[in-house]
């Protein structure tokens, strides 16, 4: 899309292709009442001095309180805290009633069981269109070692879910595959008969194994997103774990990217591949993804929790 005036929803969906973590930004207002909102626009800025930033919509109900606060905290949610993320993304009257929290050294709300937290003094507030960029100087932090909660394309993903999928498939040979997307087009290997890129698990982290394989295959930078399909192919006894992944711009070394209109006429190597591609095209068109569990002929699609990870 190259028009001077973009469709806001389409632009937001494109921004959502970038996989991020999820945070809840907290502070205390002038009356000492805790305030907070969910945000995935969190970035580390500098080690010396220790700086980070987060973006806040000017339309947020927390805008006045947050921008006038002298201090704030970033709570990096762990993979078990989807409910916390959803609570602080919605206009709930008492968001803090549903979470275990305490005041930090500088008076900011700190959540229990987060992957990490940072308490900050307000360094700067920068105007940026319909948002402001809040830059904080880290005054205290803690890293729990827990896995963080991931977010991409309107859905959550977690390392634990991937681990469970691999554990469930330990009795057979495990094939890792990917629906590798580049600006709406899907990468496929082969010439006349097309297949999803795939490799065999050799131990360790399946997402890292798959990312390394895809980058070697395509010569592009690859970000592994959410789990997309877990199924057994009874014809060969193999367990298949398929992720959604994103590729950087550029032409691949091997294979090709096909857009949805081209996929409709494509010939696939198996009915399972065709089913995955057809489901992805449909789910992409409505922006609502799920995870398939079953075999190559039938199973169940479990919806990925949807939310707006914004203030």
From Swiss-Prot:
Gene Ontology terms for molecular function: FMN binding; riboflavin reductase (NADPH) activity
Name of one Pfam family that matches: Flavin_Reduct
Disulfide bonds: none
E.C. code: 1.5.1.-
This protein's UniProt keywords: Flavoprotein, FMN, Nucleotide-binding, Oxidoreductase, Plasmid
PANTHER family: FLAVIN REDUCTASE, FLAVIN-DEPENDENT MONOOXYGENASE, REDUCTASE SUBUNIT HSAB
Broad enzyme group: oxidoreductase
KW Coiled coil (keyword) present: no
Transmembrane feature ranges: none
Protein name as it appears in the record: Probable flavin reductase
Keyword Nucleotide-binding: yes
Gene3D superfamilies (alphabetical): Electron Transport, Fmn-binding Protein, Chain A (2.30.110.10), Nucleoside Triphosphate Pyrophosphohydrolase (3.90.79.10)
InterPro entries: Flavin_Rdtase-like_dom (IPR002563), NADH-dep_flavin_reductase (IPR050268), Split_barrel_FMN-bd (IPR012349)
Protein residues bound to FMN: 38-41, 55-61, 88-89, 95
Species: Rhizobium meliloti (strain 1021) (Ensifer meliloti)
Family from the record: Belongs to the non-flavoprotein flavin reductase family.
